Each structure stands twice: as structure tokens, then as C-alpha cells.
């Protein structure tokens, strides 16, 4: 499910592509329902534009949610899937370097919603340097 809007953002295309790839790969990896739903849509307010990726996968437990951006953290129930704990860590690190926000809302067994936030009035680019 993809809803489109005419919202332009200025950021580093390569790194944004990498961030979105990590988020979408995570969503696809943790689908656990027969009917899989992955939605992408934008939102806008006075201070920012956002890209939202929402799935109906297994969700993230409330106890794991505060740790999902930690390097190497794979969650308490991730033994079924090969995980390194690097995907969301890298996505968050890159968002921070680009001046973007990254927010996650989830309910275990129901959904995960990841929002990439682009503050208005700034250009978000990153020089070629190490992100780790």
C-alpha cells in the first residue's frame, strides 16, 4: 500500500535509500501473518515532513522498544530470524548524521510504525565519512 503526495525533501539520496532499505528489510523479515501489509505514506505539519513505513508484522515488545537502536541489539524473541542487530542501529546513526528524526511506535503482535522525520527549512546532506 503506497500513498503518494507532492512533498519534496532535500537530503543525501544514497544514505536515505540505505536507511529506507534497512527499515523495509526489517519489516519484511518479521512478518508473521498470512495477510502481509506494508504501507508507505507521507505526513506533513508546520515543522516537518515525514515518511511513514507501517507493517502488520509481529511488532516489538514494550520492553525491547527502548533498546532497538542499540548496536547489536536483536530483541528478546528474535531467535527465529537471522539478525545482527545492526539494521536499526545504522538507520538511526545515519538519520542523526543527516539531521533527520527516526521514531518507532509498535504494539507486539499487531504492528510497527517507523517514521523518518525531515525538519523543514534545512538541507540534509552528509559528507563521505565513516558512520560507525
Residue ranges of predicted features:
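Conserved micro-motifs of the catalytic ATP-binding
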Residues: 4, 8-11
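Short helix-loop "hinge" at the ATP-lid/N-box region of the Bergerat-fold HATPase_c
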Residues: 27-28
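Short beta-strand/loop element within the Bergerat-fold HATPase_c
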Residues: 37-47
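Acidic ATP/Mg2+-coordinating residue in the GHKL
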Residues: 55
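Short conserved segment of the HATPase_c
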Residues: 60-72, 130-131
